[in-house]
UniProtKB/Swiss-Prot annotation:
The gene is pup1. It comes from the Bacteria. Keywords: Coiled coil, Isopeptide bond, Ubl conjugation pathway. Disulfide bonds: none annotated. The N-terminal unstructured half of Pup provides a signal required to initiate unfolding and degradation by the proteasome but is not needed for pupylation, while the C-terminal helical half of Pup interacts with ARC to target proteins to the proteasome. NCBIfam families: pupylate_cterm. This is Prokaryotic ubiquitin-like protein Pup 1.
Length: 63
């Protein structure tokens, strides 16, 4: 029975918990958008200068 009370009490504080969870979700979405933007930029560079990109990568010791 005491576990039920704890669960009910914890469920009553849902509004406070949704704040940080919502903020975390927004941060994940923003980071996802940033990653997508970086990947799009890399794709653009590779489409325009793939040969130059490979040469520069090899010259810098890329494997």
């Amino acid at each position: 029975m005491s576990q039920e009370k704890v669960q009910r009490h914890g469920g009553g504080d849902g509004e406070e918990e949704s704040g940080p969870e919502a903020a975390g979700q927004e941060r994940r979405e923003k980071l996802g958008e940033d990653v997508d933007a970086i990947l799009d930029e890399i794709d653009d560079v590779l489409e325009e200068n793939a040969e130059d990109f490979v040469r520069a990568y090899v010259q810098k010791g890329g494997q």
